[in-house]
């Protein structure tokens, strides 16, 4: 689904990903061909995509945890909330205001920002990267789904993840990494 420029923004949407899964665990308890499913997701994907696509850099295995350790803020949810907002906002003030709604104080914000600059000096915050990242995620998920189709594996997209029968979860991990 594209709101504007199809080369820089857009997201893949399906009915499956709209099934409830927070309060009523419908989606994760759905069966594919009578089998339980596994959801395999990209970890810290917007950060990873920007570093890989724009700078040919690897974010490492645990970027949120690394940022938390470098900032002294060892709450993964706070780090994730900061990254999501800082990468999605068009400017620093908008990101800071959005972070406040997540309980991230100005002091925490500055510590997280400094940790990002130290660990990932090429990472660009406050440039509205979310739309491009979602577009890239959609392209990757489309490749994974088509590969599944070629191999007879049902593969359903869920935002930045895929749902597959549990017996194919290692296939999904491998295929997502190659895509």
Describe each PLM feature range.
Residues 1-27:
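Non-catalytic nucleic-acid-binding interfaces of large nucleic-acid enzymes and RNP effectors
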Residues 17-128, 132-134:
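Helical catalytic core of nucleic-acid polymerases
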Residues 31-35, 150-151, 158-159:
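Short, well-ordered loop/turn elements at secondary-structure boundaries
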Residues 41-42, 83, 154-166:
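Catalytic palm active-site di-aspartate
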Residues 73-74, 167-171:
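Short, basic interhelical loop/turn and adjoining N-cap
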Residues 88, 146-153, 177:
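Hydrophobic alpha-helix feature that most strongly marks membrane-spanning transmembrane helices
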Residues 132-150:
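Short amphipathic alpha-helix segments
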Residues 169-179:
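Polymerase palm active-site segment centered on the conserved acidic dipeptide of motif C
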């Amino acid at each position: 689904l594209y709101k504007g420029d199809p080369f820089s923004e857009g997201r893949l949407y399906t009915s499956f990903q709209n099934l409830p899964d927070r309060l009523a665990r419908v989606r994760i308890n759905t069966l594919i061909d009578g089998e339980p499913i596994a959801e395999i997701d990209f970890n810290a994907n917007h950060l990873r995509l920007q570093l890989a696509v724009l700078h040919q850099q690897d974010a490492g295995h645990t970027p949120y945890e690394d940022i938390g350790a470098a900032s002294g803020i060892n709450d993964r949810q706070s780090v994730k909330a900061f990254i999501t907002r800082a990468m999605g906002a068009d400017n620093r003030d908008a990101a800071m205001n959005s972070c406040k709604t997540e309980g991230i104080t100005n002091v925490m914000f500055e510590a997280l920002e400094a940790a990002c600059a130290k660990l990932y000096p090429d990472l660009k915050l406050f440039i509205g990267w979310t739309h491009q990242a979602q577009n890239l995620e959609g392209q990757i998920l489309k490749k994974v789904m088509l590969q599944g189709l070629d191999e007879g594996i049902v593969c359903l997209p869920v935002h930045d993840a895929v749902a597959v029968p549990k017996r194919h979860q290692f296939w999904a991990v491998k295929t997502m990494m190659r895509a």
